Protein backbone atom coordinates (compact mmCIF):
# COMPACT_ATOMS: atom_id res chain seq x y z
CA UNK A 1 0.00 0.00 0.00
CA UNK A 2 1.25 3.48 -0.91
CA UNK A 3 1.14 6.11 1.84
CA UNK A 4 3.08 9.06 3.25
CA UNK A 5 3.54 10.75 6.60
CA UNK A 6 2.61 14.44 6.84
CA UNK A 7 6.33 15.24 7.22
CA UNK A 8 6.99 13.74 3.77
CA UNK A 9 4.56 16.01 1.94
CA UNK A 10 5.97 18.70 -0.32
CA UNK A 11 4.77 22.30 0.09
CA UNK A 12 1.85 22.00 -2.36
CA UNK A 13 0.72 18.63 -0.96
CA UNK A 14 0.75 20.09 2.56
CA UNK A 15 -1.08 23.26 1.49
CA UNK A 16 -3.83 21.25 -0.20
CA UNK A 17 -4.30 18.35 2.22
CA UNK A 18 -3.66 20.06 5.56
CA UNK A 19 -4.58 23.71 4.93
CA UNK A 20 -7.53 23.20 2.55
CA UNK A 21 -5.64 24.84 -0.31
CA UNK A 22 -6.18 24.49 -4.05
CA UNK A 23 -3.48 23.85 -6.62
CA UNK A 24 -3.45 25.78 -9.91
CA UNK A 25 -5.76 24.49 -12.65
CA UNK A 26 -4.11 22.89 -15.68
CA UNK A 27 -0.77 22.91 -13.81
CA UNK A 28 -1.10 19.74 -11.78
CA UNK A 29 -0.13 16.13 -12.30
CA UNK A 30 -3.41 14.38 -13.10
CA UNK A 31 -5.73 16.94 -14.75
CA UNK A 32 -5.21 15.33 -18.17
CA UNK A 33 -4.04 11.88 -17.07
CA UNK A 34 -6.20 9.00 -18.31
CA UNK A 35 -4.10 5.87 -17.78
CA UNK A 36 -5.96 2.82 -16.43
CA UNK A 37 -5.65 2.50 -12.65
CA UNK A 38 -6.76 3.85 -9.29
CA UNK A 39 -6.20 7.05 -7.36
CA UNK A 40 -5.48 6.71 -3.64
CA UNK A 41 -5.30 9.13 -0.73
CA UNK A 42 -1.71 10.37 -0.66
CA UNK A 43 -1.49 10.05 3.14
CA UNK A 44 -3.47 6.92 4.03
CA UNK A 45 -3.13 5.01 0.76
CA UNK A 46 -6.87 4.28 0.82
CA UNK A 47 -8.40 3.86 -2.66
CA UNK A 48 -10.64 6.79 -3.58
CA UNK A 49 -11.32 6.83 -7.36
CA UNK A 50 -10.74 4.75 -10.49
CA UNK A 51 -9.84 5.74 -14.02
CA UNK A 52 -13.14 4.12 -15.07
CA UNK A 53 -14.95 7.07 -13.46
CA UNK A 54 -12.54 9.83 -14.55
CA UNK A 55 -13.67 12.23 -17.26
CA UNK A 56 -12.52 15.40 -19.00
CA UNK A 57 -14.39 18.33 -17.46
CA UNK A 58 -12.26 21.21 -18.78
CA UNK A 59 -11.93 22.62 -15.25
CA UNK A 60 -8.18 21.97 -14.96
CA UNK A 61 -8.32 19.42 -12.15
CA UNK A 62 -8.92 15.66 -12.15
CA UNK A 63 -12.66 15.01 -12.30
CA UNK A 64 -14.50 11.82 -11.36
CA UNK A 65 -18.18 10.91 -11.60
CA UNK A 66 -18.16 8.93 -8.35
CA UNK A 67 -15.99 7.76 -5.49
CA UNK A 68 -14.82 4.17 -5.45
CA UNK A 69 -16.20 3.67 -1.93
CA UNK A 70 -18.42 6.28 -0.27
CA UNK A 71 -17.12 5.16 3.14
CA UNK A 72 -13.67 6.57 2.29
CA UNK A 73 -15.04 10.07 1.52
CA UNK A 74 -16.46 12.69 3.89
CA UNK A 75 -18.54 15.57 2.51
CA UNK A 76 -18.76 18.86 4.42
CA UNK A 77 -20.42 22.22 3.75
CA UNK A 78 -17.77 24.76 2.69
CA UNK A 79 -18.77 28.44 2.91
CA UNK A 80 -15.34 29.88 2.08
CA UNK A 81 -14.77 32.60 -0.53
CA UNK A 82 -18.42 33.72 -0.39
CA UNK A 83 -19.67 30.46 -1.93
CA UNK A 84 -21.55 27.46 -0.63
CA UNK A 85 -19.89 24.28 -1.86
CA UNK A 86 -19.47 20.69 -0.75
CA UNK A 87 -15.93 19.94 0.36
CA UNK A 88 -14.59 16.41 -0.08
CA UNK A 89 -12.16 15.00 2.51
CA UNK A 90 -10.61 11.59 2.93
CA UNK A 91 -12.16 9.70 5.84
CA UNK A 92 -9.02 7.96 7.11
CA UNK A 93 -6.44 10.79 6.90
CA UNK A 94 -8.91 13.70 7.09
CA UNK A 95 -7.13 15.30 4.12
CA UNK A 96 -8.76 17.97 1.99
CA UNK A 97 -9.23 16.45 -1.48
CA UNK A 98 -11.34 19.04 -3.31
CA UNK A 99 -15.06 19.58 -3.89
CA UNK A 100 -18.03 17.79 -5.43
CA UNK A 101 -20.46 19.57 -7.76
CA UNK A 102 -23.71 18.54 -9.43
CA UNK A 103 -22.61 19.49 -12.96
CA UNK A 104 -21.07 16.16 -13.97
CA UNK A 105 -22.16 13.85 -16.81
CA UNK A 106 -25.87 13.08 -16.41
CA UNK A 107 -25.39 9.58 -17.83
CA UNK A 108 -22.94 8.88 -14.96
CA UNK A 109 -25.11 10.26 -12.16
CA UNK A 110 -24.53 14.00 -12.56
CA UNK A 111 -21.71 14.47 -10.04
CA UNK A 112 -18.26 15.94 -10.62
CA UNK A 113 -15.69 15.24 -7.94
CA UNK A 114 -13.12 17.98 -8.61
CA UNK A 115 -9.98 16.70 -6.89
CA UNK A 116 -6.54 18.23 -6.31
CA UNK A 117 -3.76 16.11 -7.82
CA UNK A 118 -1.61 17.01 -4.80
CA UNK A 119 -3.97 15.03 -2.54
CA UNK A 120 -3.92 11.77 -4.51
CA UNK A 121 -1.47 9.22 -5.89
CA UNK A 122 -2.04 7.22 -9.07
CA UNK A 123 -1.52 3.44 -9.04
CA UNK A 124 -1.35 1.90 -12.55
CA UNK A 125 -3.65 -1.04 -13.24
CA UNK A 126 -0.72 -3.40 -13.87
CA UNK A 127 0.71 -2.59 -10.40
CA UNK A 128 -2.49 -3.09 -8.39
CA UNK A 129 -1.71 -6.67 -7.35
CA UNK A 130 1.95 -5.95 -6.57
CA UNK A 131 1.14 -2.92 -4.39
CA UNK A 132 -1.65 -4.58 -2.40
CA UNK A 133 -4.68 -3.35 -4.34
CA UNK A 134 -5.44 -6.57 -6.25
CA UNK A 135 -8.97 -6.77 -4.86
CA UNK A 136 -9.82 -3.64 -6.90
CA UNK A 137 -9.18 -5.25 -10.29
CA UNK A 138 -12.87 -6.25 -10.34
CA UNK A 139 -13.81 -2.56 -10.80
CA UNK A 140 -12.34 -2.44 -14.31
CA UNK A 141 -13.82 -3.43 -17.63
CA UNK A 142 -12.02 -6.35 -19.24
From Swiss-Prot:
- List S-S links within the chain: none
Q: What is this protein called in UniProt?
A: Peptide methionine sulfoxide reductase MsrB
Q: Which GO terms describe its cellular component?
A: cytoplasm
Going by the UniProt record, its keywords in alphabetical order are:
Oxidoreductase
What GO molecular function annotations does the UniProt record carry, in alphabetical order? peptide-methionine (R)-S-oxide reductase activity
- Top-level taxon in the UniProt lineage: Bacteria
Question: Which parts of the sequence belong to the MsrB domain?
Answer: 2-125
SUPFAM superfamilies on file: Mss4-like
Q: What is its EC number?
A: 1.8.4.12
Similarity comment: family membership = Belongs to the MsrB Met sulfoxide reductase family.
Q: Which NCBIfam families match?
A: peptide-methionine (R)-S-oxide reductase MsrB (TIGR00357)
Kindly state which reaction or reactions the protein catalyses.
Answer: L-methionyl-[protein] + [thioredoxin]-disulfide + H2O = L-methionyl-(R)-S-oxide-[protein] + [thioredoxin]-dithiol
Query: One biological-process term from Gene Ontology?
Result: protein repair
What Pfam families does this protein map onto?
SelR
Amino acid sequence: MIKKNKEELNDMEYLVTQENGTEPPFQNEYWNHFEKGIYVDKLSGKPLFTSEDKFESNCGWPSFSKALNDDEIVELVDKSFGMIRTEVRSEKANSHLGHVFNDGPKEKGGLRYCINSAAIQFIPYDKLEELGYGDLIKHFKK
